[in-house]
C-alpha cells in the first residue's frame, strides 16, 4: 500500500479485523506469544468488520472489551465470527453477558490439554443456554497420547458442544504435516480429525468409522 503499512489480515480476508495482538497464556504449541508477545498490544484504531480475530478476548481488560463492543455498536457492523475465540481460564459469566448481545456467531474456545478440563467445563456451564451448534470447541490432538486426546473430543460432545479437531503442527514446520509422536500414526491423526470435523460422530462411533473409512 503506497504511503502506509500493509494490513496483511485484510489482504488475507477483507471481512476480518483485529483489535489486539499478543496473548499472556504462552502455550508451547502456539505461535502467537513467539510472534506477538505475551503482553497485549491494543489496537484501538481497528476498523469493525464481521470477523474479529483477537487471540484472547476474555483476557483483555473489561474496559477494553467494552470499548470493542461499543465500537461495533456505533458502526452498525454485525459481528458474525469471533474467530480465535475466548480463553476458558478467563471466561466468566460477566464475559458471556458482555458479548452475548453482539456475538451473532458461535462461541469458540479450546480444550487443548487434559489439565484444562475444569476450566473448559466451567465455560460450557456458563454457555448452557446456547445450542450445541453455537458452542465450537477447538481440540488439539497429537500433543498428548491418543486416549487423552480422544477423551477430550468425547467430553466436548458429551457436554453438548461441537468439536473442531486440529492435529498439532510444529511451530517451525515448512509444510502442514502434523507431529507424529506417542502412540499416534499419521493415519490415526487424519481419521480422528475427519470423524470429528465432518460430524461423522453423530452417526457412527470412532472405532467403527476406522473399519469403514475410505482413505
Name each region found by the language model.
Residues 1-53:
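Acidic, low-complexity intrinsically disordered segments
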Residues 1-3, 89, 171-173:
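A short acidic, often aromatic-flanked loop/helix-cap motif at beta-alpha or helix-coil junctions
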Residues 1-5, 9, 185-186, 206-214:
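A basic- and aromatic-enriched beta-loop-alpha substructure that forms the phosphate/nucleotide-
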Residues 4, 8, 72, 189-196:
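Generic hydrophobic, helix-prone segments enriched in Leu/Val/Ile
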Residues 12-14, 27-29, 62, 92, ...:
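Short acidic, gly/pro-rich beta-turn/loop elements at beta-sheet edges
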Residues 31-123, 133-142, 162-167:
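Core AdoMet radical
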Residues 43-44, 192-215:
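Short amphipathic alpha-helical segments
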Residues 50-51, 103-108, 115-201:
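Conserved C-terminal portion of the radical SAM core fold
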Amino acid at each position: 500500500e503506497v504511503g502506509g503499512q500493509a494490513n496483511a489480515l485484510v489482504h488475507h480476508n477483507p471481512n476480518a479485523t483485529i483489535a489486539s495482538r499478543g496473548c499472556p497464556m504462552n502455550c508451547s504449541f502456539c505461535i502467537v506469544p513467539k510472534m506477538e508477545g505475551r503482553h497485549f498490544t491494543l489496537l484501538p484504531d481497528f476498523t469493525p468488520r464481521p470477523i474479529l480475530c483477537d487471540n484472547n478476548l476474555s483476557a483483555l481488560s473489561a474496559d477494553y472489551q467494552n470499548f470493542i463492543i461499543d465500537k461495533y455498536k456505533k458502526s452498525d457492523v454485525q459481528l458474525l465470527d469471533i474467530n480465535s475465540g475466548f480463553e476458558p481460564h478467563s471466561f466468566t459469566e460477566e464475559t458471556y453477558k458482555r458479548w452475548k448481545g453482539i456475538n451473532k456467531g458461535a462461541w469458540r474456545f479450546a480444550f487443548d490439554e487434559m489439565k484444562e478440563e475444569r476450566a473448559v467445563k466451567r465455560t460450557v456451564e456458563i454457555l448452557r443456554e446456547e445450542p450445541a451448534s453455537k458452542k465450537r470447541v477447538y481440540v488439539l490432538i497429537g500433543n498428548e497420547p491418543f486416549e487423552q486426546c480422544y477423551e477430550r473430543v468425547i467430553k466436548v460432545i458429551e457436554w453438548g458442544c461441537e468439536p473442531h479437531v486440529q492435529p498439532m503442527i510444529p511451530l517451525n514446520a515448512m509444510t502442514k504435516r502434523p507431529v507424529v509422536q506417542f502412540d499416534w500414526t499419521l493415519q490415526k491423526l487424519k481419521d480422528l480429525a475427519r470423524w470429528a470435523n465432518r460430524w461423522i460422530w453423530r452417526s457412527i462411533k470412532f472405532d467403527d468409522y476406522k473399519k469403514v473409512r475410505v482413505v
